[in-house]
């Protein structure tokens, strides 16, 4: 892990609120369209270590076989560039009388560094993506790291006041997260973790990512009922489940083969590939 951290340097990171439109409307309406542009350039500052991708003393090990594709994907040629990523986050909100409205947001990205890989063509015995040649990325890696986009939030909401109580309802793709956890694993594997899958790919490899980009919205119906000043009832029903997102197999920040659904083979002791 120490060598992995030392092997990466942030050369430049730029984030700017490129456009923030507040539309002129009547007092009852609020319409906003915000766009954030973020650019990152990263480079590895150390060359590939043989003991990392071949195991100790030059002997092949399971750990090396499962993790070699990541470090071999970027060498020190071309300044050892790991990423030249451009991100755009667009958010559109329409609110009427602060009580009703909708929100839709989406993100898009382009990273020329993931157009191809530096993985050598002579290491087929531990290559985890045989559907493409070493030196290329699979379809899943290209979609997630090279060029792509996705819808994030897409929901409607309403708030009602009933006497001294209030009821809030949201329907559609949105994020909720209840409470805190004393242990780190509780935030991931507990009730809160089940509500909002995390985009660990962005957390690990895209500096400057905000929480609203890391917690992935899912389709659900949620309510908040304020009974008294000291009592609030919350409920939700989820219509879909999303997996936690990890860096794809063969990319620089991938921790190991076999952790994503798009891994085709995992290499175990003796360098023998195993179909997953």
Locations of regions flagged by a protein language model:
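Transmembrane beta-strand segments of Gram-negative outer membrane beta-barrel proteins
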Residues: 23-68, 102-106
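Outer membrane beta-barrel
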Residues: 98-255
